[in-house]
Amino acid sequence: MAGAMTLLSWGGISYPQGYEKAGMMDYLRDAVKWGTDYFIKCNTGYDTGEYEFYGQVGNGDFDHSSWSRPEEMPDWRPSYKIDASNPGSDLAAETAASLASAAMLFDGVDDAYAAELIDHAELLYSFADERRGKYSDSITDAYAFYNSWGGYNDELVWGAIWLYKATGKQEYLDKAISYYDQFGFGSKTQFLSWDDKLAGAQVLLAQETGESRFVQLLTIFS
């Protein structure tokens, strides 16, 4: 869900004239805000500055046993969280990316909301960076359905570069480049998915730095 919100915002940021000409920009912002409002509610540690984020509501096996409307499932709905003792760097960093990209989409339209999104994004990225771990190791019910196959390194780069774009803070760009090099990401990738953000990170790094090593990888993307 966080990955979907990031990509929706990215589309609006990259092609605003297309959305405006189609009369769809307001609909796009509404769709993104539906997701980011939810993420803000899930970030339950925000008021105290603690690391606590609810990453899943519902049991996978139980939910998949019924293909009906949520309104017709007033049954067992357990909730699962990540926190300082049970981290989820991939989930926290991806959510930070979604909030940061959404802040850019709302910049100049609802500045108070954009600022709120940045505040939550920065806390979540700190959580991801300081308490390392795969979310599916902490929320074990997710393993059979949305396991973090690729780990969290790509999301740490992805989240940092989005925060740089949204805030202009050099520390985030420095961190994105440092982690990109540290994690050995200097090779081409074949796809962008909810679990693998390397291709997207390479695009953003190429745009923000203009460095040939990032640009070259995009010319051979396949």
List PLM regions with ranges.
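Glycan-recognition and catalytic cores of secretory/periplasmic carbohydrate-active enzymes
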Residues: M1-S222
